[in-house]
């Protein structure tokens, strides 16, 4: 990344044209000065990558897209990054469909809002190559209700709202199956849809809605499967959830949340530094506390994340 261009006021007035031997001297000095400036620009570009910005003091600004800007862990990570000369600028998105296109179009430098399965679906659907550069946590996907206090209280033919994006929808169906509320044909998979529900063998009916609207749907349904960030933003108490999947199990691998970059920036040292800072004790504790203790920290090598992503992309392509 090159430094921002200077304005016209920064260009010094040219002296009278020199004569004689001074011409060669001035030319040599000018060439040397240009060489130094070019070398500095190349160094800054190497350190900051193609999207972030470096100021005159060498501080780097990195734009990170998220859907949970209000989470209490962000100030902790932002302060820690600032100590390393990295100024994090958060860009909040109101739903899950916006942050990956924004990253691909270089409107932001990184994003942190999604798990690997969501990323796999995006890459396949959009023929994209966004890639994980660091893991963070796995959070449960839980069932909440304003009308019932236990799964057993949900009546036959009760209505359950679930997220309608493919990855969270499939996970929600698996959660409901684990809770004994429905059955999926063939046992279901990470790509299950409402069409896979065995209605004759199921107790409830599902209603897909936008993930951001699952909380708002609570008064009109028996229960809703709600993503952790939306549940916390709505001040729902995770301990009052009727049911949730177990983020510590191996089956949770597709749901590892990750920092994501463009493929060209996957080795950017500034971006990788931010991903590493997440696992410092103070930052990690803040993230887990922000989830009300529901999140499980995951620190997997990037090679593992790339392997899991490649496998999930293969599964998604096969389904299409």
Q: Which residues fall in each region the model found?
A:
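Short helices/loops that flank or line small-molecule/ion binding pockets
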Residues: 79-80, 92, 97-111, 174-175, ...
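Ligand-binding "clamshell"
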Residues: 121-133, 148, 220, 225, ...
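An extracytoplasmic/periplasmic, membrane-proximal ligand-sensing/linker region
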Residues: 59-62, 69-73, 221, 279-320
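Terminal targeting segments of Actinobacterial cell-envelope proteins
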Residues: 1-25, 51-57
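Short, well-ordered beta-strand elements
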Residues: 57-69, 86-92, 158-160
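Immediate post-signal peptide segment of exported/extracytoplasmic ligand-binding proteins
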Residues: 45-63, 81-82, 151-157, 313-320
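A bilobed periplasmic-binding-protein/Venus flytrap-type ligand-binding module shared by bacterial periplasmic
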Residues: 140-151, 255-273
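A conserved helix-loop-strand patch within extracytoplasmic ligand-binding domains
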Residues: 133-183
């Amino acid at each position: 990344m090159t430094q921002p261009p200077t304005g016209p006021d920064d260009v010094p007035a040219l002296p009278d044209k020199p004569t004689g031997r001074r011409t060669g001297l001035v030319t040599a000095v000018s060439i040397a000065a240009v060489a130094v400036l070019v070398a500095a620009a190349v160094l800054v570009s190497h350190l900051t990558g193609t999207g972030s910005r470096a100021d005159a003091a060498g501080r780097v600004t990195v734009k990170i897209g998220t859907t949970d800007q209000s989470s209490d862990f962000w100030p902790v990570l932002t302060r820690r990054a600032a100590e390393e000369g990295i100024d994090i600028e958060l860009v909040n998105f109101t739903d899950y469909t916006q942050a990956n296109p924004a990253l691909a179009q270089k409107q932001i430098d990184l994003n942190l809002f999604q798990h690997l399965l969501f990323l796999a679906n995006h890459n396949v659907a959009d023929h994209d190559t966004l890639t994980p550069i660091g893991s963070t946590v796995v959070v449960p996907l839980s069932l909440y209700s304003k009308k019932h206090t236990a799964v057993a209280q949900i009546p036959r033919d009760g209505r359950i709202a679930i997220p309608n994006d493919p990855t969270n929808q499939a996970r929600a169906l698996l959660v409901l199956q684990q809770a004994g509320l429905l059955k999926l044909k063939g046992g279901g998979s990470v790509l299950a849809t409402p069409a896979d529900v065995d209605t004759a063998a199921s107790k409830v009916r599902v209603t897909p809605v936008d993930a951001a609207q699952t909380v708002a749907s609570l008064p009109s349904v028996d229960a809703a499967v709600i993503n952790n960030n939306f549940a916390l933003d709505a001040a729902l108490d995770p301990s009052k959830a009727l049911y949730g999947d177990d983020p510590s199990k191996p089956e949770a691998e597709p749901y590892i949340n990750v920092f994501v970059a463009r493929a060209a920036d996957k080795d950017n040292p500034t971006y990788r530094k931010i991903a590493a800072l997440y696992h410092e004790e103070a930052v990690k504790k803040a993230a887990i506390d922000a989830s009300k203790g529901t999140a499980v920290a995951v620190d997997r090598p990037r090679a593992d994340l790339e392997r899991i992503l490649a496998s999930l992309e293969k599964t998604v392509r096969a389904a299409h």
